[in-house]
């Protein structure tokens, strides 16, 4: 009796399901400015092009305010240059994606009782949906209706065939938000003669002599501890943190202010709310990320400042991370958060977050913050107490997935509670 390998069986059923669930039609390519922002990748005989329409573009295409319903269409074109059929797996793009007809009927007005049983069958959305199977030598294009992610949309496009599994990862900026880091000119952040290429010993000395904490604008008040060092290009930093589930943040303007106030009052989630400025190198943070939890009162905040230092050709950033456990109104920044006093727990949580997200290449520790025992805590600008072992976590981030088992350890310094770790 011939035993069929398990992978072959899985491939067979996936391709069969894709073939049965899709008709071999060619969906027209919808025109629009979003196609000018399309990105293409090619691997192992397959070329994938992806684009993400903005809220206005989505409404123009489909005639419905999809973003207001939490639906974000992602346009794909898959060109199969192999001699075998391949199947696109939409759950890789979004595990709980919407079907085309589901996306068409998500407003409350569409859910009223109807007498015409065909009224819920929206042929426009159905015809626009992505076809899952792509025969050899052919191409297919269409939309996948995913959950809404404003700012930079990060997603996978996974394909499977007899030759195996072929994954693609995209990070596509979507117009609509006024993001803080979009105004930063990275190339001219410092004069050219201020950039320093450092050896490991020189970097250790520089980092450990940097300020312990961020400050207020005047440089006088002591804010939260600068407990992170990140090494990587701006793009690697964006992609690593977005891959790990962090959201970009908006600047403070009228629109973001109203959204923040609304979230504060309702306790709702505003994933991209502005982050108040703290100062290192005499300027506010260059990038801020946040990870929302249940509501605006509970989230993690992360700030990064690019330093003038370079290590092995890569930019070195100083950073600060805190876990917010409450919120109150503030005169200058609309709201301000109360932080969890155990800032080391939050720091280590970031290490685990990046490692599990395959966004981390190497890790180390350095001093520089200064110890603050639990019985002698320090306070930040708003009077919130915190305690720490005084170490800075050094993270080499990557935009290319790295297995958690392949993360390297650099033993520059070892915190006391990790002395026994080999």
Protein language model annotation of sequence segments:
Residues 28-68:
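Low-complexity, acidic Ser/Thr/Pro/Gly-rich terminal tails and inter-domain linkers that flank the onset
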Residues 17-19:
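C-terminal motif of bacterial Sec signal peptides marking the signal peptidase cleavage site
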Residues 84-92, 155-157, 238-242:
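Short, hydrophobic/aromatic beta-strand segments
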Residues 79, 254-420:
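A cross-kingdom signal targeting lumenal/periplasmic-facing segments of multi-pass membrane
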Residues 27-29, 35, 96, 126-194:
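Surface-exposed edge beta-strand/loop patches
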Residues 58-75, 81-85, 133-135, 218-219:
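Short, solvent-exposed beta-strand/turn "edge" segments of beta-rich domains on protein surfaces
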Residues 21-24:
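Bacterial signal peptide processing site
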Residues 81-134, 140:
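The feature marks short-to-medium sequence segments in extracytoplasmic or secretory-pathway proteins
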